[in-house]
Each structure stands twice: as C-alpha cells, then as structure tokens.
C-alpha cells in the first residue's frame, strides 16, 4: 500500500492536522459500485462468500451493539421461497432477486436503538465487499414485511433466530 503524507497546516489559532492519505482500492469500490439486476446462475465459491460475510460483520454499529445478523441463503428452495414472499409483497410474479443464486438476509435486533442504522451499515459493507470481489449485488427491499409475516417468522424460527428482529434487506 502506497502512503502519501500531507503536511499539517496552521491557520490562526487553529491547527489543522492532516493524516496520511492512503492510495486505497476502497475509494474506487465506493465510487464504482452499482446495483446489479442480472446474475449468473453459478453459486459463488464458499471462500468468496465467507469474505463477503466477514466484511459485513465488520460494519460499524451504535455503541458496539452489533444489532445485525446475516443469514446466507444458499438453499435454492429457501431462496425461491423468499423470492415468492418478496414478490407477493411487491405485487408481481417476477423474481425480485433477479436470479441471484444466493441471498444474504440482514436482520437487526429492534431492541437496540440504532438497529436500522446498524443493519444498513452491514448491507453497505456486504455490497462493497461483493463488488471488490467481482460480484454484483442489489439491496432488495421489503425484508421488513417478509419477516414480519407469519411465513417469515416461521423461517426465522427454522433458522434458530429468536427475538425481535426486523428485516433490513
């Protein structure tokens, strides 16, 4: 990693401290990531998927509460069930996941004051990591309605998730 230093500048009684500037690929990822609405049917490798999930777990959270959890849905039947639930909420028969072979569900604990922000930060980390690893992603909404439904609550229970969780994306 290449490091460039800038100098501290003093203006009047205020001293401005300028930290090192890093030539990082992260900035490029931030500027070039776009939502993808067409996917290849191949499942990403377990290694790639784990790197994306790990990046999601490093998202910031209010007071370190870690209110969000991520569920990687790689089972086609469950993925298709989620797709159907989401499509019904949207009022369409089309696949709202655009054929993506894996769906990452982010849920956040409603009892934490910053749960919506925490879950949203996880979503962004997941998307940036996917982009950095050459995969497309798209934040699909309606997860709140999905997991507030009886079918959604049954899925959470089958996954061993207990508590007051809201679907973020």
Question: What residue ranges belong to the model's regions?
Answer:
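Intrinsic-disorder-associated, low-complexity terminal segments enriched in Asp/Asn/His/Tyr and depleted
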Residues: 4, 13-14, 22
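Short hydrophobic alpha-helical segments enriched in small aliphatic residues
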Residues: 6-8
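N-terminal amphipathic, basic helical "cap/leader" segment at the start of enzyme domains
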Residues: 19-102
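Small-aliphatic-rich amphipathic alpha-helix that forms the alpha element of a beta-alpha
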Residues: 56, 111-155
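Structural motif
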Residues: 69, 101-104, 136-138, 169
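Helix-adjacent hinge/juxtasegments
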Residues: 88-124, 128
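A glycine-rich helix N-cap at a beta->alpha junction
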Residues: 94-96, 154-169
């Amino acid at each position: 990693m290449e490091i460039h230093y800038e100098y501290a500048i003093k203006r009047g009684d205020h001293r401005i401290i300028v930290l090192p500037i890093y030539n990082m690929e992260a900035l490029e990822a931030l500027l070039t990531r776009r939502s993808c609405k067409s996917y290849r049917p191949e499942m990403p490798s377990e290694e790639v998927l784990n790197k994306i999930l790990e990046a999601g777990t490093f998202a910031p959270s209010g007071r370190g509460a870690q209110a969000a959890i991520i569920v990687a849905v790689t089972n086609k039947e469950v993925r298709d069930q989620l797709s159907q639930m989401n499509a019904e909420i949207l009022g369409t028969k089309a696949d709202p996941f655009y054929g993506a072979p894996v769906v990452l569900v982010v849920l956040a604990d409603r009892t934490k004051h910053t749960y919506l922000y925490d879950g949203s930060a996880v979503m962004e980390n997941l998307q940036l990591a996917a982009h950095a690893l050459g995969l497309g992603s798209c934040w699909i909404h309606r997860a709140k309605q999905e997991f507030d439904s009886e079918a959604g609550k049954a899925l959470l229970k089958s996954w061993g998730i207990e508590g007051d969780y809201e679907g973020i994306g």
